């Protein structure tokens, strides 16, 4: 999932209703071929691209065919949506309304999972990127209207569609609507709700300055050939007969980025361009066992990310909202025990690398992180709560169930009362 950028504008205006005769969508894509040819791959592709192997293509096909529930609010029924179905329906409808889609791509953690599922990161959101032209406000509004109208095609049989409007569908099934329209960024995002956090995120991109934070999340997989193969071929895929699927790395070097993913290496380019959420992703990777590349200036990298975090989220209330939302999205269910480890790591990074705040602002943020860490520790049970010292968790992110009574004195986890007065904003 990609968070709202600075300057993002919510798409809240009601959209005109668009026809829904797109259930039998046919996506236009490159011709599907047989198995990958290594020699052809090396000769025809740049360093930022690579052909997917047969096991990777199988994982991609299974991911696109796995039904994902889109949960409705109130009395609206749950929709069962296969990613490949909604891509085909939306793409066909967009092109019927004069909006040409250049390509459709799988982006982010899901693409990384397809390429190397043993990384330990898994994936939550399913990021589907539609590369297209968005040159006017009309294009943005038409894109939103098309997606909302296409949701009608996925309503269960027997549900009356007569009085359902696009505004009703937005309120029922859309978790987030974002529009970014600046000189360098022109894109919109429609996120469909899923209670377990596996949201289907449809992103419509004309241009964007940066779509990745680190090399390991810079992958995009072009879906066009696989989608076309599924529509046109009656023969099941096999190792000897399957479409040629291409992956790209926005980091710039596909092989290097894949090696980073396989060996749990944190690397990036132009760290000053990383958005505010990159700090949380960095701490997340550290907790998962990733480590910065030896040649990385870690202190400079952390300073860039801390500065950007406080530029994008200057308000303490907003910081808490972002932290809680990130923890819920990435450390839910069985992963909840890792929240404490992530917050301990975040506290350490902010404490060591923040140079852009006044001292009282820095203390307020550190106290907020400490409070959330204490809550996460309490959720691990009474035994964990017995250790209220600031202690580094084990490699699995879990505080040991048995806590020794003798604890070496360390920095306390509980926030201290500060003597400074409440600061009021200047007029």
From Swiss-Prot:
Keyword set includes Transferase: yes
Region annotation Disordered: where it falls in the sequence: 1-49
InterPro entries found in the cross-reference section: TET5
UniProt GO BP: negative regulation of apoptotic process; negative regulation of cell cycle; negative regulation of cell population proliferation; positive regulation of translation
Record keywords, A-Z: Cytoplasm, Nucleotidyltransferase, Nucleus, Transferase
GO molecular function annotation: poly(A) RNA polymerase activity
Cellular localisation: Cytoplasm; Nucleus
Principal EC category: transferase
Residues passing through the membrane, by range: none
GO CC annotations, alphabetized: cytoplasm; nucleus
Similarity comment: Belongs to the TENT family.
Protein name: Terminal nucleotidyltransferase 5B
Native source organism of the sequence: Mus musculus (Mouse)
């Amino acid at each position: 999932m990609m968070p709202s950028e600075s300057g993002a504008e919510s798409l809240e205006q009601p959209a005109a209703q668009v026809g829904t005769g797109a259930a039998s969508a046919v996506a236009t894509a490159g011709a599907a071929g047989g198995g990958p040819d290594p020699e052809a791959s090396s000769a025809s592709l740049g360093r930022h691209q690579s052909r997917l192997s047969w096991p990777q293509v199988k994982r991609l096909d299974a991911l696109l065919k796995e039904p994902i529930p889109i949960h409705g609010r109130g009395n609206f029924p749950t929709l069962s949506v296969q990613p490949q179905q909604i891509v085909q329906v939306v793409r066909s409808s967009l092109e019927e309304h004069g909006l040409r889609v250049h390509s459709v791509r799988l982006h982010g953690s899901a693409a990384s999972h397809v390429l190397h599922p043993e990384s330990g990161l898994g994936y939550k959101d399913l990021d589907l990127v539609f590369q297209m032209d968005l040159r006017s406000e009309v294009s943005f509004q038409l894109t939103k209207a098309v997606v909302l109208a296409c949701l009608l095609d996925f309503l269960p049989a027997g549900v009356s569609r007569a009085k359902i409007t696009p505004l009703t569908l937005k309120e029922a099934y859309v978790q987030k609507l974002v529009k970014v329209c600046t000189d360098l960024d022109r894109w919109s995002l429609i996120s469909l709700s899923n209670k377990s956090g596996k949201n289907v995120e449809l992103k419509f991109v004309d241009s964007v300055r940066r779509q990745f934070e680190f090399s390991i999340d810079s992958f995009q997989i072009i879906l066009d050939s696989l989608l076309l193969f599924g529509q046109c071929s009656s023969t099941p895929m096999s190792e000897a007969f399957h479409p040629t699927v291409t992956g790209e790395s926005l980091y710039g070097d596909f092989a290097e980025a894949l090696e980073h993913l396989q060996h749990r290496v944190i690397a990036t380019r132009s760290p000053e361009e990383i958005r505010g959420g990159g700090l949380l992703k960095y701490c997340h990777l550290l907790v998962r066992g990733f480590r910065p590349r030896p040649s990385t200036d870690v202190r400079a990298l952390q300073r860039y990310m801390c500065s950007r975090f406080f530029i994008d989220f200057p308000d303490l209330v907003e910081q808490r909202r972002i932290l809680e939302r990130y923890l819920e999205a990435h450390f839910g269910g069985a992963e909840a025990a890792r929240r404490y480890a992530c917050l301990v790591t975040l506290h350490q990074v902010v404490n060591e690398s923040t140079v852009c705040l006044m001292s009282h602002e820095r203390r307020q943020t550190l106290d907020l992180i400490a409070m959330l860490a204490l809550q996460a520790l309490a959720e691990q049970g009474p035994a964990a709560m017995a250790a209220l010292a600031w202690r580094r968790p084990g490699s699995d992110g879990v505080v040991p169930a048995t806590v020794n009574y003798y604890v070496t004195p360390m920095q306390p986890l509980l926030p201290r009362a500060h003597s400074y007065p409440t600061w009021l904003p200047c007029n």
